[in-house]
Swiss-Prot record:
Keywords: Ribonucleoprotein, Ribosomal protein, RNA-binding, rRNA-binding. InterPro entries: Ribosomal_bL20, RIBOSOMAL_L20_CS, Ribosomal_protein_bL20_C. This is Large ribosomal subunit protein bL20. One of its GO terms (molecular function) is structural constituent of ribosome. GO terms for biological process: ribosomal large subunit assembly; translation. Disulfide bonds: none annotated. It comes from Granulibacter bethesdensis (strain ATCC BAA-1260 / CGDNIH1).
Length: 119
């Protein structure tokens, strides 16, 4: 049976890791062993932050809606309660976009919410 030498596969694996770790600081981009550790950690951060990103954007939308609603003398929680009573089915992403881009349209939504709360 012939002897199996793994130089080609090892080189390919090292090359793949070093290519993926390009742009890392210091030896993290040039030394295979350190690059492998940094690359694994970077993938962990990426996995975690794909989930955190969703939370962060939701928090941003809520802050934008809250700021816009307070200009009309209302709080965020009261506004969301009024939306449900008025049966306006818009998510926070859309509401934040309207509040940010089109103040007049958002003012109309607030009027409908105030009407639903008064009733």
């Amino acid at each position: 049976m012939a002897r199996v030498k793994r130089g080609v596969t090892t080189h390919a694996r090292h090359k793949k890791v070093l290519k993926a770790s390009k742009g890392f600081f210091g030896r993290s981009s040039t030394n295979y062993r350190i690059a492998l550790e940094r690359l694994e950690k970077s993938l962990q951060y990426a996995y975690r932050d794909r989930r955190v990103k969703k939370r962060d954007f939701r928090a941003l939308w809520i802050q934008r809606i809250n700021a816009a609603v307070r200009e009309h003398g209302m709080t965020y929680s009261v506004f969301i309660n009024g939306l449900k009573k008025a049966e306006i089915d818009m998510d926070r992403k859309v509401l934040a976009a309207i509040a940010f881009d089109d103040a007049a349209a958002f003012a109309e939504i607030v009027k409908k919410v105030q009407g639903a709360l008064a009733a």
